[in-house]
Regions:
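Glycine-rich beta-alpha-beta "Rossmann" dinucleotide-binding loop(s) and their flanking helix/strand
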Residues: 1-10
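Thiamine diphosphate
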Residues: 9-21
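An anion/pyrophosphate-binding glycine-rich loop and adjacent beta-alpha core
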Residues: 19-21, 27-113
Length: 113
């Protein structure tokens, strides 16, 4: 429920079919309230921007330009905080050194294109 209105960025085939099959076969269900959210998606791309951008010194701000949470809590926890912001939007703010670190990641390079 915390991420009910989050942008989905998983595989399009992930529709919960395995859960339905398991239930139909009488499998026990547990921990279905768990999730892995991500607080950094490249705008217009749906590509997760890996969290080292933040753990190495970047921060996130809302549309008003204000930092709204402690990003050190983790990217799943931060995803919930982003959803609490106007328009469910946050901007990652970082410097050239963080940019250089992130260039090693293919997803980051794709998001730049």
């Amino acid at each position: 429920p915390e991420l009910e209105h989050a942008t989905f960025h998983g595989h399009p085939g992930n529709k919960g079919d395995a859960i339905a099959w398991g239930r139909a076969l009488g499998a026990a269900m547990a921990d279905l309230g768990a999730y892995q959210g991500h607080a950094g998606l490249a705008a217009g791309h749906g590509i997760p921007i890996l969290w080292p951008l933040i753990t190495e010194g970047g921060v996130q701000v809302n549309r008003a330009g204000r930092r709204f949470a402690n990003e050190a809590a983790g990217y799943s926890e931060q995803a919930v905080e982003v959803l609490r912001q106007d328009g469910h939007v946050a901007w990652s703010i970082f410097d050239e050194a963080r940019h250089a670190i992130m260039l090693q990641f293919e997803d980051y390079r794709q998001a730049l294109s």
